[in-house]
């Protein structure tokens, strides 16, 4: 999912290949390393469960900042859309060009969902199954990514509301969700 997201934004913004590689290596290596180290130490009983939460926290922080980079890219997309003069072309591009490409990272979420469902035998419990599907489903992720972008475009373009209000209004709930998930999870 992370690779798909980076690929999407690198294509969209024509990023240099060096930045593309560094971003992938940095994000993936730290997240994967924290997960592997935590799992190995717990399985070998070298650390207790509470200490392992430190590694989980590191992984969550890295994921949070990676999401922040993606949101920054989304803001640049929205800013570019707002600057377009032809509304028909603007929304045509948004639907026909960018939204289909956005499906690339959602494939990662779908595979992660299937992995968790079968690994944890979520079918044995409807509550567990609903929890897994709710946090990983393609619809939920598309809502988190696409709706705020559309909201900012609409508020800025049609209601002439400045970015100082439009951005917090549309992205604020998503940030709160991530913070809540980081603290509680």
Regions found by a protein language model. Give the residues of each.
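Hydrophobic alpha-helical transmembrane segments and adjacent short intramembrane/lumenal linkers
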Residues: 92-184
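Selected alpha-helical membrane-embedding segments in polytopic membrane proteins
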Residues: 3-113
């Amino acid at each position: 999912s992370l690779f798909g997201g980076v690929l999407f934004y690198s294509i969209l913004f024509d990023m240099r290949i060096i930045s593309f590689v560094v971003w992938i290596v940095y994000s993936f290596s730290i997240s994967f390393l924290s997960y592997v180290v935590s799992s190995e130490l717990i399985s070998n009983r070298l650390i207790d469960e509470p200490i392992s939460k430190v590694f989980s926290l590191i992984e969550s922080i890295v994921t949070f900042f990676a999401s922040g980079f993606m949101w920054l890219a989304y803001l640049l997309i929205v800013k570019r859309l707002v600057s377009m003069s032809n509304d028909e072309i603007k929304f045509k591009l948004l639907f026909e060009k960018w939204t289909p490409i956005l499906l690339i990272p959602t494939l990662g979420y779908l595979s992660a969902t299937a992995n968790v469902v079968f690994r944890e035998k979520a079918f044995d419990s409807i509550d567990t199954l609903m929890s897994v599907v709710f946090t990983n489903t393609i619809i939920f992720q598309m809502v988190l990514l696409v709706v705020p972008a559309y909201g900012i475009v609409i508020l800025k373009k049609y209601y002439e509301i400045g970015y100082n209000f439009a951005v917090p209004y549309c992205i604020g709930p998503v940030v709160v969700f991530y913070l809540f998930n980081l603290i509680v999870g």
